[in-house]
Swiss-Prot record:
This is Large ribosomal subunit protein bL28. Signal peptide: none annotated. It comes from Brucella anthropi (strain ATCC 49188 / DSM 6882 / CCUG 24695 / JCM 21032 / LMG 3331 / NBRC 15819 / NCTC 12168 / Alc 37). The keyword Ribonucleoprotein applies. Belongs to the bacterial ribosomal protein bL28 family. InterPro entries: Ribosomal_bL28, Ribosomal_bL28/bL31-like_sf, Ribosomal_bL28_bact-type, Ribosomal_bL28_sf. GO terms for biological process: translation. NCBIfam families: L28. Keywords: Ribonucleoprotein, Ribosomal protein. GO terms for cellular component: cytosolic large ribosomal subunit.
């Protein structure tokens, strides 16, 4: 399992610890990842995703998983999230035709 957010693509970054004496040692900055279950209102199902705390805030801010995925760029999403986005778009298109 990679240390990357499935919705925003945030992943491990590398840098230095810098001491008071200005000694530098390499370190990793890990993203704050959480295993969460998010509900898709369009599909009527819940999905387990590994997302960063920042992405979770963004999902709530945009009004849910469906709205977040529709507005997000494909290159940031994981393969699972892209598949989910396509399913949501297909279901919304079917609902628009039926209405």
């Amino acid at each position: 399992m990679s240390r990357a957010c499935e919705l925003t693509g945030k992943s491990v970054q590398y840098g230095n610890n810098v001491s008071h004496a200005n000694n530098k040692t390499r370190r990793r900055f890990l993203p704050n990842l959480c295993n969460v279950t998010l509900m898709s209102e369009t599909l009527g199902q819940s999905y387990r995703l590994r997302v960063s705390a920042n992405a979770l805030r963004s999902v709530e801010h945009r009004g849910g998983l469906d709205a977040f995925l529709v507005k997000s760029d494909d290159k940031e999403l994981s393969q699972r999230a892209r598949l989910l986005k396509r399913q949501i778009a297909k279901k919304q298109a079917e609902a628009a035709v039926a209405a």
